[in-house]
Regions:
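Outer-membrane beta-barrel proteins
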Residues: 23-32, 80-83
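Outer-membrane beta-barrel signature, preferentially recognizing the C-terminal barrel domain
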Residues: 48, 55-112, 122-156, 183-187
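Membrane-embedded beta-strands of outer-membrane beta-barrel proteins
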Residues: 4-6, 36-40, 51, 80, ...
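Transmembrane beta-barrel strand/turn architecture of Gram-negative outer membrane proteins
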Residues: 18, 22, 31-48, 188-190
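Hydrophobic core residues within well-ordered beta-strands of beta-rich domains
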Residues: 2-4, 16, 34, 47, ...
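Gram-negative outer-membrane beta-barrel transporters
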Residues: 11-18, 108-111, 132-209
Length: 209
């Protein structure tokens, strides 16, 4: 596999910026693929607003294609018939940044063709003979869509102390069946705090998450 990537940053008018990128991927099995990226940003004062589009391509890994692994009676099996995964990602983002406070929110849609995922399938006679109780196999999901929102907040409280948190919502579905994708997480979040102290040439940093 070989990949080449080029990117250019273009500033135009006042407070406007564009980032244009193009990746070329050559894979000895799945041949050539171009994946473009375009991001537009408008920055009035302490605010940034972005709109982004990017195309993605992921070839199946060797593990997903060929390897069989067994652990505690569960067999994870490769699949030589896997197709490469392709995606089209669209996002809008807004953020505010100051010395003491920042907040960022992103809404996105990711449309995927041939999403590679692991699904439970029926046991074979060989599995049963080898005391396998569960068989998982890598398969392609023909059409999938992930719609989500990411929010993060950070604040500086003084005396070297900062506090932050994040929340993510992701609705991941097989669009052909309208069923949730296996092992997808719909809600997630985190809270973290940080204390930073500088003594001359030395810095002490303590982080709790």
């Amino acid at each position: 596999t070989m990949a080449l990537y080029t990117q250019d940053e273009i500033k135009f008018l006042q407070n406007f910026q564009a980032i244009v990128g193009l990746r070329y991927i050559y894979h000895e099995t799945f041949k050539n693929r171009f994946t473009p990226k375009l991001s537009l940003m408008y920055s009035p004062g302490a605010f940034n607003f972005r709109a982004t589009y990017s195309s993605g391509f992921r070839a199946p890994s060797l593990e997903e294609l060929y390897y069989n692994k067994e652990k505690n009676g569960t067999l994870s099996a490769g699949n030589i018939n896997l197709k490469p995964e392709k995606s089209n990602y669209y996002a809008i983002n807004g953020e505010f940044m100051s010395r003491l406070f920042s907040i960022s929110a992103t809404a996105y849609i990711n449309n995927l063709d041939n999403l590679i995922t692991s699904k439970q399938v029926a046991l074979t006679e060989t599995d049963i003979a080898n005391s396998i109780t569960k068989r998982m196999e890598y398969q392609n999901v023909d059409k999938a869509r992930v719609k989500g929102v990411d929010i993060s907040i950070n604040s500086y409280l003084g005396y070297g102390i900062s506090l932050g948190g994040s929340y993510s919502f992701a609705d991941a579905k097989d669009t052909n069946t309208d069923s949730r994708l296996p092992r997808s997480i719909k809600h997630s979040g985190s809270i973290n705090s940080n204390w930073n102290k500088v003594w001359g040439f030395y810095t002490l940093n303590v982080n709790l998450a």
